[in-house]
């Protein structure tokens, strides 16, 4: 079993490929199957339970915990995304949208009108409302929604022009070691009611940028620029910014780059994503809730953001390291935190700060935010099934799905089936092709060994360029492309060097992170060899060690806080518990 470091080497990519962007296929042309579809369906069903129905979803200021618009916006967003990914009509979304105007204030946004100060959590919550409404409009094209989007943008965000430049970013002024799973207003400085979720105002920035993308309203540009400039001045690590808010802001930067054509914003997002990878990502690719606060908990909202951001940075750079990172986030973090009811919950953060190598449940379900964002996360996984760039089709992830690429009046349809990530076989059946000759681009992940490719059972030479496989050919209906490869177990250094010991390591089988559910602490050597067996465990040939993947499909036992410990950090000597 090899020992390697997981290091993204991106310097050649940051400046060289800034103008390249590949685009995902439309939801209408993607039908996912298998475990991903089941995850989407369970999340969709959860978002249609009573808590999220029209008579319950609209909250007072007190009920929301001073987060006006947050629950409503995230719920609309989750339902819109789940609906597109599953191709099912939401049961209650129309009624929610019909009732929405009744719950807006006299200025057309959620929460009270505060004439004398800026309310950070109100801007964040209404930012989610903007995101939900924008995605609803893009999906339905219902023009009346534009008036609500415009009122929120004009009467709440535009009203704050000049205030964003003085948003308090001095670490010495901010209360940096407080906060619960749901943030709260913790202090007032310089005309700002500030949240313990430090930096959540920039969640609103992402919503405003998407509103601008749709409205194309020039008056919003100075406000967006003011918010962007202030975000770029924040020392995320020193101020201990919330990772979810910071990653959402970075997604906003990429969105703004796509709108403006200014690739500087991609570069700035990339720099901050690297900071997050070093100081904000846990040992199984979840997140510390705040930068540098290693004794806290994770939040699937940020996991969703990190997954989306990794793929979006790949779109702009074509750096395959981002694809590998996205795979590990998906299987070991996003899937890990989806609970038995389809919602999403928080985990602990194994490492030195909490003195444990064990991954465990912290909160069964973050029903107030992460369950809804999980809908967007899973839907983006479906959307990212395939991408196109000047006629080249990229299939960056292996999924069970049917998808179609349409170019003018011509198209090609594939049915993809695979046993990955447990096995190394992927098959693409061509249902029909009127495009003629085309180029397909598959990933050649670093964990894929002895790759072979065949068409209709006849093996062909693999055209591997770096970590991509390219196939340029003319396909007809019923043709079959097959990929075969071997997956191996690999040792990797810890993700966060500040919160782990130098002798500790992580184990992977392909993208799947391995763990021990044994009652006793497991010790491993760097050269320990593990092989998968039919019972789902990985066994060592020369010891009684057996491990499993932390990935699960909504395991009903992973629910109660502290009841299902999995060892994910391994070392040669036993860790002394204090």
Model-inferred region functions:
Residues 17-74, 78-113, 144-151, 161, ...:
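Low-complexity, Ser/Thr/Pro/Gly-enriched N-terminal "stalk/linker" regions
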Residues 40-41, 45-66, 111-128, 168-203, ...:
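Carbohydrate-binding/catalytic loop surfaces
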Residues 82-97, 136-150, 211-225, 257-270, ...:
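Structural helix-adjacent loops and short alpha-helical linkers that scaffold large soluble proteins
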Residues 435-455:
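Beta-strand-rich binding/interaction modules
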Residues 448-472, 491-499:
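Solvent-exposed beta-strand/loop surfaces of large extracellular or lumenal domains
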Residues 258-278, 293-342:
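Catalytic-core region of carbohydrate-active enzymes that cleave or remodel glycosidic bonds
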Residues 66-84, 93, 121-138, 195-212, ...:
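Well-ordered alpha-helical segments within folded domains of soluble proteins
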Residues 269, 323-429, 464, 484-578:
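C-terminal beta-rich recognition modules with glycine/proline-rich loops and embedded aromatic residues
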């Amino acid at each position: 079993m090899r020992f390697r470091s997981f290091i993204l080497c991106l310097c050649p990519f940051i400046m060289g490929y800034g103008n390249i962007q590949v685009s995902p296929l439309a939801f209408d042309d993607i039908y996912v199957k298998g475990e991903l579809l089941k995850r989407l369906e369970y999340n969709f069903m959860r978002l249609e339970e009573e808590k999220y129905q029209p008579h319950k979803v609209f909250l007072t200021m007190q009920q929301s915990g001073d987060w006006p618009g947050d629950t409503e916006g995230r719920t609309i967003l989750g339902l819109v995304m789940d609906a597109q990914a599953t191709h099912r009509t939401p049961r209650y979304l129309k009624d929610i949208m019909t009732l929405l105007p009744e719950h807006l204030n006299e200025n057309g946004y959620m929460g009270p009108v505060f004439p004398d100060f800026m309310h950070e959590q109100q801007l964040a919550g209404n930012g989610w409302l903007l995101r939900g409404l924008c995605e609803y409009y893009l999906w339905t094209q219902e023009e009346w929604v534009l008036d609500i989007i415009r009122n929120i943008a004009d009467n709440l965000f535009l009203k704050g022009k000049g205030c964003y430049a003085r948003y308090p970013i001095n670490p010495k002024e901010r209360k940096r070691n407080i906060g619960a799973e749901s943030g709260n207003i913790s202090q007032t400085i310089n005309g700002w009611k500030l949240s313990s979720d430090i930096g959540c105002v920039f969640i609103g920035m992402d919503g405003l940028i998407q509103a601008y993308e749709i409205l194309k309203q020039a008056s919003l540009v100075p406000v967006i620029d003011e918010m962007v400039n202030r975000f770029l001045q924040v020392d995320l690590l020193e101020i201990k910014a919330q990772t979810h808010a910071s990653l959402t802001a970075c997604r906003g930067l990429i969105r703004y780059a796509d709108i403006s054509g200014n690739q500087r914003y991609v570069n700035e997002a990339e720099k901050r994503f690297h900071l997050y990878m070093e100081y904000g990502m846990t040992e199984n690719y979840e997140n510390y809730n705040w930068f540098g606060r290693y004794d806290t908990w994770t939040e699937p909202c940020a996991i969703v953001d990190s997954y989306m951001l990794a793929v979006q940075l790949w779109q702009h750079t074509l750096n395959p390291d981002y694809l590998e990172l996205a795979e590990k986030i998906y299987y070991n973090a996003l899937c890990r935190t989806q609970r038995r009811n389809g919602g999403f919950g928080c985990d602990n953060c194994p490492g030195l700060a909490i003195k444990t190598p064990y991954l465990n449940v912290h909160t069964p379900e973050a029903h107030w935010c992460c369950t809804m964002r999980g809908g967007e996360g899973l839907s983006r996984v479906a959307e990212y099934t395939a991408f196109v760039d000047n006629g080249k089709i990229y299939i960056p992830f292996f999924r069970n799905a049917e998808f179609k690429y349409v170019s003018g009046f011509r198209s090609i349809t594939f049915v993809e089936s695979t046993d990955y990530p447990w096995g190394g076989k992927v098959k693409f059946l061509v249902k029909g092709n009127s495009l003629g000759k085309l180029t397909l681009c598959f990933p050649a992940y670093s964990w894929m060994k002895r790759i072979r490719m065949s068409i209709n059972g006849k093996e062909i030479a693999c055209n591997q360029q770096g970590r991509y496989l390219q196939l340029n050919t003319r396909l007809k209906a019923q043709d079959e492309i097959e990929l075969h490869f071997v997956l191996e177990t690999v040792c990797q250094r810890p993700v966060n060097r500040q919160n782990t010991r130098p002798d500790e390591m992580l184990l992977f089988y392909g993208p799947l992170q391995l763990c021990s559910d044994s009652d006793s602490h497991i010790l491993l050597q760097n050269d320990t060899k593990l092989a998968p067996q039919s019972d789902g465990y990985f066994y060592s040939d020369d010891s009684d060690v057996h491990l499993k993947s932390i990935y699960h499909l909504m395991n009903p036992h992973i629910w109660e806080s502290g009841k299902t410990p999995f060892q994910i950090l391994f070392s040669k000597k036993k860790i002394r518990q204090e």
